[in-house]
Amino acid sequence: MSLLRSLRLCLVARTGSCPLSALGPGPLLPSLQAGLPLLQSPQQWHTFHSGSWLSSASSKELLMKLRRKTGYSFINCKKALETCGGDLKQAESWLHKQAQKEGWSKAARLHGRKTKEGLIGLLQEGDTTVLVEVNCETDFVSRNLKFQQLVQQVALGTLLHCQNLKDQLSTYSKGFLNSSELSELPAGPEREGSLKDQLALAIGKLGENMILKRAAWVKVPAGFYVGSYVHGAMHSPSLHNLVLGKYGALVICETSELKANLADLGRRLGQHVVGMAPLSVGSLDDEPGGEAETKMLSQPYLLDPSITLGQYVQPHGVSVVDFVRFECGEGEDAADAE
């Protein structure tokens, strides 16, 4: 075959058609004699290989909807829809299961790495208040929205756990959950599995070791009030009454009547607990100095050191009965020293 004829045949292969006369003399392939292109167009090839469910606008909308809802990549969302025959609910479940597998695998590889950073989360609803701590490796990840959503899920899980405790209160109740207990709590009505499954998902997405460190909860009846404070506070983007930060405190007060300024008073008491780190409440009769320096009521008041906290509280007609203080990452330095 001549060079010119070969080049003409290549031209046919690229364009899909050409006048038969342009090929010059000589025998032609049967497909060319019938006037058919040698190759299908690129668009036809793409449609054939992409799966029939992607050929309609509604299917592409499904892909976009799954992407927006889950946050996973287009490639993974497309694979999920293909695997599940275009069923959106099944595709979402499939994605979460795959991500969980990857997360558990990554968690096993990262286990043991130090988690000194993270966030404290404080959530109040009705007569219930919870304080949680979730740790990660770097401050950079603690500022990531996905990590903050994990803290939110842990706070909500703890709140639901506390609200499900059917006890008749004559006084306040307070409880703590360690890492293991916290991990086993249900993830919530809109989430599958437990909080440890949500932890695995977050580890898979963010690539750092993380732990659900601890939680505290307080329930109060009438006649009690819980003051709260979070240092460096920022509000959750999707849950207005969840506050995030590096330090958090709850202060339980008993009061004979509901006062208009209780919220401000509770915040100031929480600030004192965060700043002065008392170890116990103490009493109004404690003398300042010595061991009393660790007792809340005999400590110099944080915002006015000329008086004790007890002297500040007394005119307001409330009694401080208990408190909880969380500092993000506390205990890690001591563990390193050991």
From Swiss-Prot:
**Record-level Gene Ontology MF annotations:** translation elongation factor activity
What UniProt keywords are attached to this protein's entry?
Elongation factor, Mitochondrion, Phosphoprotein, Protein biosynthesis, Transit peptide
Residues modified as N6-succinyllysine: 89, 146, 205
Query: Which residues are annotated as modified residue Phosphoserine in the UniProt record?
Result: 283
Q: What is its main location?
A: mitochondrion
UniProt xrefs under PROSITE patterns: EF_TS_1 (PS01126), EF_TS_2 (PS01127)
**Residue range of the transit peptide?**
1-55
Q: Which domain of life is it from?
A: Eukaryota
A Gene Ontology biological process in which this protein takes part is: regulation of mitochondrial translation
Q: Which family does it belong to?
A: Belongs to the EF-Ts family.
Function field? Associates with the EF-Tu.GDP complex and induces the exchange of GDP to GTP. It remains bound to the aminoacyl-tRNA.EF-Tu.GTP complex up to the GTP hydrolysis stage on the ribosome.
Record-linked HAMAP family = EF_Ts
Name of the protein this chain belongs to: Elongation factor Ts, mitochondrial
